[in-house]
Amino acid sequence: MSHPPISPEERFAKVVKALLTNSKVTQSEKKGFGSSALTVNGRIFATLNHEGKLLVKLPKLRVDALVASGKGERFDPGRGRPMKEWATIEPVSGDLWLPLAREALNFVASKR
């Protein structure tokens, strides 16, 4: 018996729940990129955008690899200039959301 599909909001809530176990992670009350964002050291590393896609900050080469593999797209905030270190991940690739959010957490936490 198959389960009904999970909504992007429900999937992101699971990511949030898993990552909030890290004492350095908080969920912003502000709206970052269209929805409540996960932050570390006051910096956004993951959020759910207004299209229901996971938005994560990763190294440029990792974003390039996700784009090349068809698993992600560069995030364009609407100015026609995609951001080098931000990728969006479709809801159909939901099994990647938590691992990529963890990668984003580690990447942003390592930056000073």
Features from the language model and the residues they span:
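Charge-dense, helix-prone N-terminal extensions
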Residues: 1-112
